[in-house]
Amino acid sequence: MKRTLLALALLAIGTAQAAEERPSNAADQTGLAVTIYNGDLALVKDARKVKVNNGDNYLAWRDVSARMQPETALLRSLDGKKLTLLEQNFDFDLLTPQKLLEESVGDSVRVIRHQPITGVEVSEYATVLAANEGVVLKFSDRVEASLPNPGRIAFMGVPANLRDRPTLSMVFRADVAPTGFLTPANATAEQGMELSYLTGGLTWKADYVAELSSKEDSIDLNGWVTLTNTSGTAYNNARLQLIAGTVNRTQPERAPMPMMAKTMAMADAAAPMQEEGLFEYHLYTLDRLTNLLDNQTKQVALLSAQKVKVDKEFRLTGGDWYYAGQYGDLGKKLKPSVFMEFTNKAEKGENTGLGVPLPKGIVRVYKKDSAGRAQFIGEDRIDHTAKGETVKLKLGEAFDITADKKQTDFQKLAVTGFNARPGGLIETAYQLEIRNAKSEKVVVTVVEPIAGEWQMLQESHPHKKETAHSAVWEISVPAEGKVTLTWRVRVKY
């Protein structure tokens, strides 16, 4: 009988130990990897050393992202041990005075009053009846709707569902014995484990700074990655990787939480990130461990390229709408857009630093003035740009180049529908006078979109058919001079 009671007692002790929740926090980490995607998505791989019981374990994995998607969480053993996950709960209801009060409704608390004259503290017990817009307390002889001033509440404990930080609570079954050995019921051992999950609250974007040379024929280009962490936890000593490209997701993206980053950290520009292809995307890896604190924005160097050859273009683009009707004057002092263009490739025999895939982002361009001070001259957004592709940046509008455009003739030669559309044959003519106030000659690219089937009948300068629906002229305008471009076109709608 005594032996039976002793066995039952030992079994009860073992069960209590197994049921006891064991916490694990960031101090247990042996490795941390974070891969951030476009579109408020990241993959976190958190490796830790955890003390594990033989049999059922109750583990509180603390310091996870508050924006984690718990359905994506995956726990695995790094030591090859058998591990069976039975249950998991994502506890993101964080401990605050108000939450503690709300969870204590119906419970007994101790109310402590301070006597301002005597300085003596007096306490009595009360039951929390409500915690909405204040607190309602029921004492043995009365009900009060607020705390005494000065006064405070002492709670009996913290409810199990309230955490001081985001926590993934897990129940799993483990076998801690070496292969081929029997395991005592109360055996414990340290085991390497990795928790991986997808989360929001981690974003990245690329930004580029280009300095245009004095001759305006080359740029020095530096790329930066701006990382923002609003996920509710910090990632210290993390291996950081970035995915550029559009990853398909079956659920709509959640909007980023309305939080402002508290700090801005700038990293050294000397070590660009390493790039490689991954499936149909591109992966960028930081070659050192980094810290990304909660509510922090950090910048790290992406690339650095020197003396990248560029071409400047003045481009005046019209519209296809005025080819179908009679309009006369089409604009005075029209200003060409200024573009800067370069090819994402390394020149033969030159190590410019280009020739790698460029993530989408904003390129900001600067040029030094006569005193050597860099001045901002424009910016434009680029899409993901593969190796060998052309980057074209619109920087603004030309100040010293203007143009006047007018329609000089319009004839309906045939009508097969109401007015000119949806059917008809039209002949129309135009005049474009381009003036150059600069002290050097310029070449202006004139682009005229023309809908329908068209035929150029007359023109003062030869055009190129850039596409089926556009005519393009390259017009050289002398310094402080002007040139008039005329053309007549027949259009069938």
Name what the model sees in each region.
Residues 2-8, 17-493:
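Long, intrinsically disordered, low-complexity accessory segments associated with secretion
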Residues 13-15:
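N-terminal signal peptide c-region/cleavage motif recognized by signal peptidases
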